C-alpha cells in the first residue's frame, strides 16, 4: 500500500531534521565558558558553509580560548556613565589636546593629504587617535580572535559579534589579520581601534605602500578613520559640534554621548590652534 501524502511529508521532515549536523544544534550562545568549545566547532562548520576555508578556520581557532578578561571589560564599562567633565578628566582630555597640537604640526603634510582626500580635518582624527590608544601608545593585549569569538558566543550581543567574527575570519583569509594578533578587549584593531567589520569596509592604504596596516602605520590608521567618518556622512568644511552637520559622523564612531562630545571638544581645541 502506498503512503498517504501527509505521512510522506512527516517522514520527509523527520529525515531533514536528522540530517542537520549535531554541531549546528550546539551553536547556541552561553553565559559561561562551559559551552564555548562546542560553540566554536559549530561556528567553524557554519563559517565553512559561508566560504571560509577549513585551513583558515583551523589556523584561526588553533589557540582560541574563552576570554574572561573580555567578559569583565564588557560588563564593566563605567566611564561612559560619567559626566562630560569627569570623562574628560579620566581620559586625559587636556593631555590629548596638548599632544594633539604637537602631532598636528609634526605631521602637517599627512593631515593635509587626508583632509584633501576625505574632507576630515586633523582635529577629530587626533582626538580619536589620542582617546583610543594614546596616539598608538597602547593598542591592547587581548588575543583578538579569542575576544571576538567570546563575545560572539556570549548571549548579551551574540548576533552583533557573530557578524564581527565573520569579518575577522575574512580578514584572516585575506592575510590582513594575523591569527596571533592582539588588541583591545572587544577585538578592536589598530591605532584608532577599528572593529573587524569596519576594517573590511573602511580600511585604506594611507601611506601608499600597497598594503593595509592599522597597527604599524599611523597613515593607514588615520586615513581609514577619515574614510569611516566620510562614510558616516562627514561633509568637507562642515562643523562637528553637537547640533552641527558632522556631529552625526562622530556618533557613528562611538555610541556613547559623553565620548562623542569629548571628541568634538578635543578636536575643536586642536583645530583651533
Question: Where on the chain are the PLM-derived regions?
Answer:
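Bacterial N-terminal signal peptides that target proteins for export
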Residues: 1-11
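Hydrophobic alpha-helical segments
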Residues: 9-10, 23, 44, 112, ...
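C-terminal segment of classical bacterial N-terminal signal peptides
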Residues: 17-25
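Cleaved targeting-peptide boundary
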Residues: 24-33
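Mature N-terminal segment immediately following signal peptide/propeptide cleavage
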Residues: 32-54, 58
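Catalytic glycan-binding domains that act on GlcNAc-containing polysaccharides
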Residues: 52-273
Amino acid at each position: 500500500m502506498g503512503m498517504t501524502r501527509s505521512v510522506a511529508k512527516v517522514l520527509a521532515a523527520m529525515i531533514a531534521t536528522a540530517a542537520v549536523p549535531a554541531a549546528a544544534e550546539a551553536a547556541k550562545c552561553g553565559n559561561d565558558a562551559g559551552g564555548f568549545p562546542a560553540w566554536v566547532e559549530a561556528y567553524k562548520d557554519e563559517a565553512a558553509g559561508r566560504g571560509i576555508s577549513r585551513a583558515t578556520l583551523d589556523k584561526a581557532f588553533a589557540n582560541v580560548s574563552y576570554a574572561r578578561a573580555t567578559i569583565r571589560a564588557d560588563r564593566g564599562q563605567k566611564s561612559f556613565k560619567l559626566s562630560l567633565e569627569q570623562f574628560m578628566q579620566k581620559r586625559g582630555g587636556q593631555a590629548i589636546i596638548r599632544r594633539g597640537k604637537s602631532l598636528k604640526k609634526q605631521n602637517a603634510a599627512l593631515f593635509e593629504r587626508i583632509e584633501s582626500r576625505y574632507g576630515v580635518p586633523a582635529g577629530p582624527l587626533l582626538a580619536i587617535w589620542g582617546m583610543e590608544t594614546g596616539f598608538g601608545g597602547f593598542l591592547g593585549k587581548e588575543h583578538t580572535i579569542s575576544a571576538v569569538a567570546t563575545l560572539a558566543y556570549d548571549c548579551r550581543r551574540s548576533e552583533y559579534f557573530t557578524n564581527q567574527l565573520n569579518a575577522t575570519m575574512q580578514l584572516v583569509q585575506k592575510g590582513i589579520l594575523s591569527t596571533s594578533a592582539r588588541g583591545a578587549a572587544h577585538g578592536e584593531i589598530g591605532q584608532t581601534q577599528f572593529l573587524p567589520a569596519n576594517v573590511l569596509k573602511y580600511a585604506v592604504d594611507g601611506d601608499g605602500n600597497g598594503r593595509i596596516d592599522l597597527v604599524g602605520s599611523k597613515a593607514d590608521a588615520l586615513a581609514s578613520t577619515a574614510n569611516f567618518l566620510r562614510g558616516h556622512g562627514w561633509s568637507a568644511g562642515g562643523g562637528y559640534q553637537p547640533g552641527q552637520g558632522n556631529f552625526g559622523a562622530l556618533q557613528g564612531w562611538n555610541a556613547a554621548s559623553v565620548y562623542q562630545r569629548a571628541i568634538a571638544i578635543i578636536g575643536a581645541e586642536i583645530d583651533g590652534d
